Amino acid sequence: MQRVIFDCNIYLQAAASSGGPAFACLEMAEQGLFSLVVSADILTEVRDVLNRVSVQKKIPKLTSAVANGFLIRVTEAANFVTPVPALITFDRDPKDQPYLNLALAAGASFIVTRDKDMLDLALEESEEGSRLRSAIPGFSVLDPASFLREMRARTEE
């Protein structure tokens, strides 16, 4: 089964809107169409972001109760990987390193994100992307809509 990692921004968007592609990605994980993979560090970041006062002011429906319910949903859908050794550095955005290291540790097929720095890993000229692709054959970084198209195409085969 394909292993997939969601960036924190995907969790935030899924928690904020049940009608968007990020939420549809989470639903696919809940349906068992792929294995959603997380680490303790990533779940801590997601919890912190969802409970930030500034985030909750921008997204009034994202109360602490909604955030906690969403986190329960994620933990029930996800598979935890421990330990996650620091095998790769990402100088362009060090905050993305936990996701890249989790991808290596889990042998992930995809990282789903809207983060430009991570999406640039898909570019052929990306040195970090090349290292990931050589370590994990078939590895891709996709935005949620592209990931949904990819998964739907695979399930139709």
Where are these predicted regions, by residue range?
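Short, well-structured N-terminal submotif of metal-dependent ribonuclease cores
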Residues: 1-38
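Alpha-helix N-cap/helix-start capping motif
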Residues: 9, 40, 115-116, 145
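Short, glycine/charged-enriched secondary-structure capping and boundary segments
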Residues: 18-21, 26, 51-52, 124-128, ...
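Hydrophobic/aromatic ligand-binding patch that stacks against planar heteroaromatic rings
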Residues: 28, 102, 133
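PIN-domain endoribonuclease scaffold, especially VapC-family toxins
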Residues: 31-35, 40-85
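A short acidic, often aromatic-flanked loop/helix-cap motif at beta-alpha or helix-coil junctions
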Residues: 44-45, 87-91, 144-152
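Active-site neighborhoods of divalent-metal-dependent phosphate/nucleic-acid chemistry enzymes
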Residues: 73-111, 116, 120
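Acidic, PIN/NYN-like endoribonuclease modules and their adjacent C-terminal/linker elements
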Residues: 106-110, 117-157
